[in-house]
Curated annotation (Swiss-Prot):
Biological source species: Psychrobacter cryohalolentis (strain ATCC BAA-1226 / DSM 17306 / VKM B-2378 / K5)
GO annotations of cellular component type: cytosol
Protein role: Required for maturation of 30S ribosomal subunits.
BP-aspect Gene Ontology terms: ribosomal small subunit assembly; translation
Localization per Swiss-Prot or TrEMBL: Cytoplasm
Domain of life: Bacteria
Protein name as annotated: Ribosome maturation factor RimP
Family indicated by similarity: Belongs to the RimP family.
Length: 166
């Protein structure tokens, strides 16, 4: 889940504006698309508000959109036109850093890998299962078919939480 140089640059510019709106920055997606790019910002309630079961509201999204628009006008880090979207990460949230996954140990995650894992005809570049543990270099996953994997964090291209209605 290595962030591109552009996403890192945008994060450094945008993070203070998001914090000024009293919400937490979960992550940023940037997709250059010809003459018009897409910048998607995910925000969530601050930890102390999450403890009180407070969620991100449409008003939070609008405030961040307004604040970030102003910052981007000043810094102009995106060439050409762009679409700015602000939302919560949702139930099936993407993970933007390894650290974000720690809070979801015991839950189901979906991984897209850089290099395949497994043996023979059971090799796979995608794995879905229970996140058993995570440390500084790897995670342990029990796949939905029961197979156990230890996966290097450096081998993860994309990771998402899989929402399961309790």
């Amino acid at each position: 889940m290595k962030l591109s140089t552009k996403v890192t640059e945008l994060t450094n510019i945008i993070a203070p504006a998001v914090a000024a709106c009293d919400v937490a920055l979960w992550g940023i997606e940037f997709a250059p698309q010809g003459n018009r790019s897409l910048l998607r910002i995910y925000i969530e309630a601050l930890p102390e508000e999450q403890a009180q079961n407070k969620q991100v509201t449409i008003e939070n999204c609008a405030a961040v959109n307004h604040q970030v628009s102003g910052i981007l006008e000043v810094h102009d880090p995106i060439s050409g036109e762009f679409i700015l979207e602000v939302s919560s990460p949702g139930f099936d949230r993407a993970f933007f850093s390894d650290e974000q996954m720690h809070a979801y140990v015991g839950q189901t995650v979906s991984l897209r890998l850089i290099q395949a894992i497994g043996e023979g005809d059971k090799k796979r570049r995608k794995a879905t299962g229970t996140l058993n543990s995570i440390d500084a270099t790897s995670l342990k996953l029990t796949a939905t078919d029961g197979e156990q994997f230890e996966i290097a964090l450096s081998n993860i291209d994309k990771a998402n939480l899989i929402y399961e209605d309790a």
